[in-house]
Regions:
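Solvent-exposed, extracytoplasmic
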Residues: 21-33, 112-162
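Extracytoplasmic/periplasmic ligand-binding sensor regions of membrane-associated signaling proteins
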Residues: 31-124
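General structural signal for secondary-structure boundaries
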Residues: 1-3, 11, 64, 71-74, ...
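Secondary-structure transition/capping residues
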Residues: 2-5, 37, 141
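Well-ordered, non-membrane alpha-helical segments in soluble/globular domains
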Residues: 19-25, 69-74
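Extracellular/periplasmic ligand-binding regions of membrane signal-transduction receptors
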Residues: 1-21, 42-60
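GAF sensory domains
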Residues: 51-61, 153-166
Length: 166
């Protein structure tokens, strides 16, 4: 929490409470799943990455990603660069900025230098959303997954020929 107070001094009491709640959630997740050592949350309202190391602006987060280390002793950038498949971990209650909802967390599993497994939550999906997707898939409906940038523009798609970059 070293630089946490720097970012919350001027924030409203409500914002301070929510940011502290997010930090507590990270601590809870890390204590519950010690193999997950690259956990962070992003508060779009505040433009901050909340990590176990404190709060970072987007610029700071990406500058620091080479110096922040995971509990397995790797740099955060190593964890981000690791090319490993998705794996389903668990359903958990996630108290986020906007809701207290049951989420399905998909984890990218990696092994640290010490041989201890660790990982990174790369996608949290509300269980209701995932249920709807699975219903459509089982009904034979054609679905396309699209990755969007912050402005809502398509970056990548699971369907060949889907327009991106427009």
């Amino acid at each position: 929490l070293s630089n946490f107070e720097n970012y919350t001094k001027s924030a409203s009491a409500d914002s301070q409470f929510k940011l502290k709640n997010m930090m507590q959630q990270i601590v809870y997740l890390e204590n519950s799943y010690p193999q997950l050592d690259s956990i962070w949350l992003y508060s779009s309202r505040d433009g901050l990455f909340i990590t176990k190391y404190g709060c970072f602006t987007e610029e700071e987060f990406f500058q620091e990603r080479y110096t922040l280390t995971t509990s397995a002793g790797r740099s955060l950038q190593d964890a981000l660069d690791e090319q490993q498949p998705f794996s389903y971990l668990a359903t958990m209650q996630v108290k986020s900025y906007y809701s207290n909802t049951e989420c399905i967390s998909f984890i990218r599993s990696v092994s640290g230098y010490s041989g201890q497994p660790d990982g990174q939550i790369i996608l949290n999906v509300k269980s209701g959303t995932l249920t709807n997707i699975l219903k459509k898939v089982s009904a034979g409906e054609d679905l396309t997954a699209v990755l969007l940038d912050q402005e809502g523009g398509a970056i990548a798609s699971s369907r060949e020929g889907f327009p991106t970059g427009e």
